[in-house]
Amino acid sequence: MRFAHLSDIHLGFQKHEALQKIEQDVFERAVDECISRRVDFILIPGDLFHVNIPEMRVQKFAFAKFRQIYDAGIPVYVVYGSHDFSPVSNSVIDLLAVVGYIMKVTLATSLDDGRIKLDFVVDKKTGVKIAGLSGLKVGKDRVYYEKLDRESLEAESGLKIFLFHGGISEMKTESGMDGENMPLSML
């Protein structure tokens, strides 16, 4: 099995034209590499875009690249990050999902006891089971992890991947970004 993990891409972040070109070139090279290496799937755990609805030029570029991935038969599994999150599914990510270019793996159900149960998306080629939680700004997603029904996730057999967007306290370096991180025990 071979997969790519592309996180914090932040398409649309750059405002200066020369930097926009670099931003797009880097993403284009990553996509081309995924296609040429024939990865089984691509994981994007948040912040594909810098905002939930980027400029039209960014949307056009993204749709063209994801069309290439789709045409190559490579599924893309995504969760929102803290920058491209939309509580009402009002994001370019949702448009990409509606046309079938990507799949959001944030399938959650609220249980009677208040816990959150995640359902898995099964990759057709590999059988890998993927579930995830989107990232929210300033660590507000912590409450979801506190309510997460871990028992059902752990009871699921087979190879599983949990897709999330956020920092882990134990992995933070001295030169790392400041912000809200979660302890590894919450995952």
What are these regions (language model features)?
Residues 41, 54-67, 72, 77-187:
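His/Asp/Glu-rich metal-coordinating catalytic cores
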Residues 1-65, 71:
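N-terminal active-site segment of His-dependent metallophosphoesterases
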